[in-house]
Amino acid sequence: MICLTPMVSLPLVTTTDSESTGPRKNHLLNWSLDQLKDWLQEQGQKPFRAKQIRRWLFSGRATSFEEMTDLPAKLRAQLEEHFAIFNATEAVVSKSKDGTEKILVRLADGGEVECVLLRDGPRRSICVSSQVGCAMGCVFCASGLDGVDRNLTGGEILEQMLRLQQRLPADERLSHIVMMGMGEPLANLPGVLSALDVARSEDGLGISPRRITISTVGLPPAIDKLAAAGIPYNLAVSLHAPNDELRSELVPVNRKIGIEPVLQAADRYFHASGRRLTFEYVLLGGINDGDEHARQLSQILRGRSVMMNVIPYNPVAGLPYRTPSGAAIARFRAILESAGVNVNFRQRKGDEINAACGQLRRNRGEVKATK
């Protein structure tokens, strides 16, 4: 267990071009490499400068065009006139004793999302949001309490990554990306894939697809589209229950889908990508943590190449759910392992700053308890 300590909340005001008066500039992170090359040619500049600019953003961690010292002064002035590197502000930065850091990012239109940097030994992982809010309605999760406003652009997703990277010392680099922040990533597949295309590229963050995980409640058509994209990202399916009756209570979107179609789509993704599947299961005390639940879960996973990530519930103020007892957790694990299921109980990180699984939220106001 992690010893809980009071939250350290550090208000951070960051001035960006998006805050200035006058016409809003183009968000540079929304522009593809080809679009940037075309723009450079229109400005009378060489197209190869596009990769130089990318390297400054992702490897050089530049936050202004003036820092891009190997670019001609005229080009730096042109970039400054037309583009903003960042299009949002850091409203609040919170840091926990275990090294986890969370940023509340305020977007140009006033929307807010949260993203997290997790430190675990040599690993430097980031948890990134894909939507402002979430429409999936999982009853125990903070992210969907206020519904969903809109999808994030690829640039807004990349901006979260860069802001989290800036929290690292110069001799450290990001190692893993998990699309497990606010929102349903597969409900914003174009934005997510465009951001990850940059994140995995050599002139981007250079992170292998094998170190990138996309989480989903299980949207079969979108899972098939992800498979068709042909990039072997890790897929994590949020299951949370071993039968349709209970899952439909906890994950309302299941009423329109059902567990079996989700499992079949996950199987298709496994065969297309060659990547072992991960299933996520938030363990709720007295609700889905019983011996029979564990046995049913073992049955539906039998014969599948999977890793089962079990996450003891991280409390959300105002919601009527609790973390299971130590005895219930131990029994649940024992039943899964005795059935041959590869199981990992996720270590709690960042819960003291509401940065743990299921705690990310855009509105920290009063929570109305759900039934």
Swiss-Prot record:
Pfam family name, one: RlmN_N
Disulfide bonds: 127-357
Cellular component aspect of the GO annotation: cytoplasm
Keyword hit for Methyltransferase: yes
Domain of life: Bacteria
Single GO MF annotation: rRNA binding
Function of the protein: Specifically methylates position 2 of adenine 2503 in 23S rRNA and position 2 of adenine 37 in tRNAs.
Protein name in the entry: Probable dual-specificity RNA methyltransferase RlmN
Taxonomy of the source species: Bacteria, Pseudomonadati, Planctomycetota, Planctomycetia, Pirellulales
Protein encoded by which gene: rlmN
